[in-house]
Amino acid sequence: MKIRVMTAVLAAKFVGYVCKKIGRQGVTWAGKVAIKICPDILEQLSSQVRKAIFATCGTNGKTTTNNMLCAALEAEGQKVICNHTGSNMLNGVVAAFVLAAKWNGKIDADYACIEADEASTRHIFPRIKPDYMLLTNLFRDQLDRYGEIDITMNILEEMMRKVPKMQIIVNGDDALSAYLAMDSGNSYVTYGISKPVIKSAANEIREGRFCKCCGEKLEYRFYHYSQLGDYYCPKCGFARPKLNFDAEDVKVGDQLSFNVEGKHIVANYKGFYNVYNILAAYAGVRTAGFYGKHFEDMLSKFNPENGRMEQFRIKGTGVTLNLAKNPAGFNQNISAVMQDQSPKDIIIAINDNAQDGTDISWLWDVDFDLLGNSTVKSITVSGIRCQDMRLRLKYVDIPSILEGDVEKAIRDRVEDGVGNLYVLVNYTALFSTRNILKKLEGEK
């Protein structure tokens, strides 16, 4: 078996190297090759992690939260394996381990931080048996792949019961996620924001409006956004649990700040949703037994990358790239963009490949009317479904420029724009757009 593990590791490393050389995303291919050679390669490698394995799940915020947790643990002097690129299905998780292994199949890691696609947890969790599951939120996403949220919840509930020793670190402000943790029988800790911070849009789409315990409509003392907030059931008493890690005195603007456990956290990020990402990572490192004394220093150096509010500079134009793949995430993206009061151009690129979900009807649940602001100087629509995106904007009387070629759209805005460009893309548009931006940034 040792020979098979070594062969799988070497073959995967070779495949990853070749793919990188020819400019391809070789991560998942490396994992696929490793499993083909050694079907139990993930069990063999993950069992060598010395202290604990974290699995990060949830609709939005997985990649940022997981990478931030990894950076926080490394700041505490720990050696960590992490699927940084966000390849979160089985092949991507396997690749994270085989590419971190030495040629002889040995792993040198105190922790593993693994982002896991919710539907893929059935293939991942039985193999790695996480010690902690960090659950960020549950929103409607890719209806043609996941179906209704209840299907995703059933999968996660099944995994919680199959790994009974796994502790859940859960967003207590999300009634759906909190119910799962509270009903699972697993031990859990919660994080959240106990007091209102910003006014939530009255017409915002909200999931999980009914109590999972008794079916009664939930009442809210206030909303943060979407269904996140202070909820309770007037019939059975189900309510937001007591928050173990509570972000207080939250400030949102050009940077974010809040207090938690007496620490003042400041981060140079935009977007209220990032308070949750930061708080989740903090809860993770604290639950692992660290006091988080290096957390603030880590934040000052942390670069989200991977298209999560990633910054580029192209011929004097500041470009911000961000992923927006469902109504809740897109609304928060728009909110973050509109916090910038300076003139701006926006490019929206929408694809409908299998990994995106071919059903793009969710675009009609996004509050695009908020982009009808004098600071928005132009909106360009691009990607495979650019015509659909243009129609969506037309229905809220927002004019747009049609340019199916993403690279040309970016070049045009860099040449003729106001010097401040936001590029909002869904999943399969992300990696190609990021490569375009990196290429353009490197041009003289």
Residue spans of the language-model regions?
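Phosphate-binding loop of NTP-binding sites
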Residues: 3-192, 200-202, 206, 210
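Residue-level signal for inorganic ion chemistry
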Residues: 115, 136, 169, 277, ...
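A conserved, hydrophobic alpha-helical segment in the catalytic core
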Residues: 127-137, 228-242, 269-300
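Cys/His-rich short segments
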Residues: 194-257, 268
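Short glycine/threonine-rich catalytic loop with a Thr-x-Gly-x-Asp
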Residues: 203-209, 269-280, 306-307
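Gly/charged, well-structured mid-domain segments that form the phosphate/adenylate-handling core
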Residues: 238, 250-253, 284-320, 324
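Active-site beta-alpha connecting loops in nucleotide-dependent enzymes
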Residues: 323-402, 440-443
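Glycine/aspartate-rich loop-and-adjacent alpha/beta segment that forms the canonical ThDP
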Residues: 423-444
